[in-house]
Swiss-Prot record:
A biological process term (GO) from this entry: translation
GO CC terms in record: ribonucleoprotein complex; ribosome
NCBIfam families listed in its UniProt record: L28
GO molecular function list: structural constituent of ribosome
Protein name: Large ribosomal subunit protein bL28
Tree of life domain: Bacteria
Keyword annotations: Ribonucleoprotein, Ribosomal protein
Gene assigned in the entry: rpmB
Pfam families in the record: Ribosomal_L28
Keyword Hydrolase tagged: no
High-level lineage: Bacteria, Pseudomonadati, Thermodesulfobacteriota, Desulfuromonadia, Geobacterales
Family: Belongs to the bacterial ribosomal protein bL28 family.
Length: 64
């Protein structure tokens, strides 16, 4: 199970945390993924991992 959105493909991004003393430590930021029961095009229901941006934009049709 990867940490990727199944709709847009958004995944982890990396960079540095920078302190006031300009010390740098590597870090990883993960997308806010939610497990959602969604309807597919053929009408079947499956659980997928979706980022909150895709949920808010209406890219996912939730199954009720």
């Amino acid at each position: 199970m990867s940490r990727k959105c199944e709709i847009c493909g958004k995944g982890p991004s990396t960079g540095n945390n920078v302190s006031h003393a300009n010390n740098k430590t590597r870090t990883t930021w993960y997308p806010n993924l939610q497990k959602v029961k969604a309807k597919a095009a053929n009408g079947s229901v499956s659980t997928i991992k979706v980022c909150t941006r895709c949920i808010r934009s209406g890219s996912v049709t939730k199954a009720l």
